[in-house]
Amino acid sequence: AAVVDGATDRTRQIADEVLLEVAPGDAVFEFIRRCVDAPSSWRAATSRRPWSGGGADRALAAMLPLIGRILEAGQRAGTVRPDIVPSDLVVTLMSVRAIGDLCDADAPGTSRRFLEFALDGLRPGHRTPDQPPMSVKQLGRVLTDR
């Protein structure tokens, strides 16, 4: 629980800083970059083990509204696709972590390159996928392996 609580607090701090310091059109992209740069934030947030015992529900309840505010600001500014939802941003962080774990030891920077491709996919001008976004309930199950 302490790992999840610490990661949640750090991610909340990043979100608050981004909301105060960053122009709305850049907020989503800066939030994700800062989370990736703070391993205590995104590593715990994308590992299953720490999320047991209700940690996922508490953390998601605390974080998704803040992520939603950042996302809505970018969507209002026209820099983020209107079909993106908060869980898409969490999945983006999970994806960057997976690439980092698989590739960065042998090819440093691969996850950063992938991150930039992923961020470009959040921008307007792309077709809405046929698949629906992951729901909060599904995200909770993924994080806790239940």
Residue spans for each PLM region:
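Short linear capping/connector segments at secondary-structure termini
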Residues: A45-G54, M134
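Phosphate/oxyanion-binding loops and surfaces in catalytic or ligand/nucleic-acid-binding neighborhoods
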Residues: E21, C35-W42, A77, V96-I99, ...
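Alpha-helical DNA-contacting segments of helix-turn-helix folds
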Residues: A1-A7
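Secondary-structure edge/capping motif, primarily at the C-terminal ends of alpha-helices
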Residues: V18, T46-P50, G100
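Amphipathic alpha-helical packing segments from all-alpha helical-bundle domains
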Residues: G6, E30, W51-L102, G109, ...
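Hydrophobic alpha-helical connector segments
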Residues: D9-S41, W51-P65
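C-terminal peripheral helix-coil segments that are non-catalytic and often amphipathic
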Residues: L64-A77, L102-R146
